[in-house]
């Protein structure tokens, strides 16, 4: 359920949130997931829907299961952002910061390794925070998944300031990326 939710939701999220008019003109390309184009926010919605369907089918507590998914999600985020770094995807803005990286596959400029910032904060730090808080709040369904959403959104919003905006979307209101608005 979750794998289908993240793949279908991630793809549809990218289509709707990031490139709607392109796919409106090229609807069959929606199915070409090997060409890239996934959205975390769409994947999140897909996972929520898949979890809802699963918990309804088996008469289980929805928020208890979203808590369990939220405990594991940072591992997937960590691995996904490391893969983005390796593939020179979703790279950061140009900088002379000490931790800058030359993405020679892109343009041979030194840039923020924003994927690594995200893998650290949205992956490792979020995993530690949620698993620590699980000990205190495991008996209250929905608390951990709510904290996941709060911390993920906070980390993503801040780190997006170092990330290169999507070329076809640019900056919104002269300051925010589309990812920040969705977060």
Question: What spans do the regions from the language model cover?
Answer:
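A feature for loop-to-transmembrane-helix boundaries and adjacent hydrophobic helices
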Residues: 1-183
